[in-house]
Amino acid sequence: MKAVDLFCGCGGMSLGFQNAGVEVLAAFDNWEPAINIYKDNFTHSVIDCDLNDSDAVAKIKAYNPNIIIGGPPCQDFSIAGSRNMGERANLTIRFAEIVSEVKPTWFVMENVYNIERMPILPKAKCIFKKAGYGLTVRILNASHCGVPQTRRRFFMIGLLDAKDDFLGRALDLALLETPMTVQDYFRDCVGEPLDTTFYYMHPRSYNRRGVFSVDEPSATIRGVNRPIPQGYKKHHGDKADPSKGGVRELTTKERSYIQTFPIDFRLEGIKTDVEQAIGNAVPVKLAEFVAARITDYSRR
C-alpha cells in the first residue's frame, strides 16, 4: 500500500502508517517549522505546498497513491462556536475534493472529535459519497489505542465501492479494554519511568485541572507548554498540590513521548514552534492503530 500524507505536520500520521507497513511516498504541508522537522526524520519527499493551489491535485496524482491520509486543520468547535469556520473549514472540503479527484482506493481523514457538530462535515461526506466511497466513522480515544493520553479524535476511513461501516467492527474489537497510562507507556516503550509521580499541564482554562498523575493517561497534549504559574490555585481535581512540591511541567521531549514519537525522533527548531508541532501531531500509535486495521482488511 502506497500513501501520500496531506497536511502532514511534523509526521505523526506518516510514521504511524509506516510502522504498520504502508509505504509513504510523499507528504505535503505549508508550515515551515513542521516541514523542517519532517525532513529531519523521513527520507521521502515533503513538499511545501498550499493545497488550495490549482496545481496541487496534479502534484499528488503524480505519485499515484492508493491511499491518501491527512488531518486537515479544523478549529475545535468548542472554541469556534457557531462562528464562520472560514479557511480552516475550507481545508476539510479541500481534502475531500482532492480525494475525489485523485480517487485513491482508500483515504483516512483525521480531525477534532466534535467536527460532527460542525456544518462542514455533511458537505465533506457528500463529496466522498458522490466519488463512490463507503465510509467508516469513529471517535477514537487514543488511550484505548496504545497512547497514554485521553485525546479523542475523529476518523473517517473511506474505501471505494464499499458499504458504510465496513471497518467499524475491526476498529471496535481492537480497542484496549484498559486505557494506557503514562507510567505504563514510559516503562514499556520509552524504557525508563518518568522521574516524577505528578506533573503539570497548562489547562485550556482554570476551570480545568492542571496536575496529573503518571498512573493515569495524560490530558490532550496541546501546542503550548508553560511552567506552573506563581500563585497557582489548586483545582479540586488536581492529583497533588504544586505548592507542596513534587510537581513539575513536562519537558518538550517527554511531551513528544506522550504523543508516542520514538526516542530517536529529532525535534529541532525554535522551542515554541516545536511545541506547537508536537501538539498538532496525530499521535503515532493512534495512526498506527488505524493503519493496522486497514492493512489487515486489505489483505483479505
Predicted features and spans:
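S-adenosyl-L-methionine-dependent DNA methyltransferase catalytic core
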Residues: M1-V24, I127-A131, R153-R300
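The conserved SAM/SAH-binding core of class I Rossmann-like methyltransferase domains
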Residues: A27-F28
